[in-house]
Amino acid sequence: GILDTLKNLAKTAGKGALQGLVKMASCKLSGQC
């Protein structure tokens, strides 16, 4: 249903945001930005 679709979208968006934050943090820590 629509609710399940929205939940999946939120999960996917959350994962993407987390991955982006981790990438940014590790690149800043290693000085390879």
UniProtKB/Swiss-Prot annotation:
InterPro entries noted in UniProt: Antimicrobial_frog_2
Organism domain of life: Eukaryota
Disulfide bridge map: 27-33
Known tissue expression: Expressed by the skin glands.
Keywords: Amphibian defense peptide, Antibiotic, Antimicrobial, Cytolysis, Disulfide bond, Hemolysis, Secreted
One cellular component (GO) term of this entry: extracellular region
GO annotation terms (biological process): defense response to bacterium; killing of cells of another organism
Cellular localization per UniProt: Secreted
Main subcellular localisation: secreted
Family, similarity comment: Belongs to the frog skin active peptide (FSAP) family. Brevinin subfamily.
Reported function: Shows antibacterial activity against representative Gram-negative and Gram-positive bacterial species, and hemolytic activity.
Name the record gives this protein: Brevinin-2Eb
Organism, scientific name: Pelophylax lessonae (Pool frog)
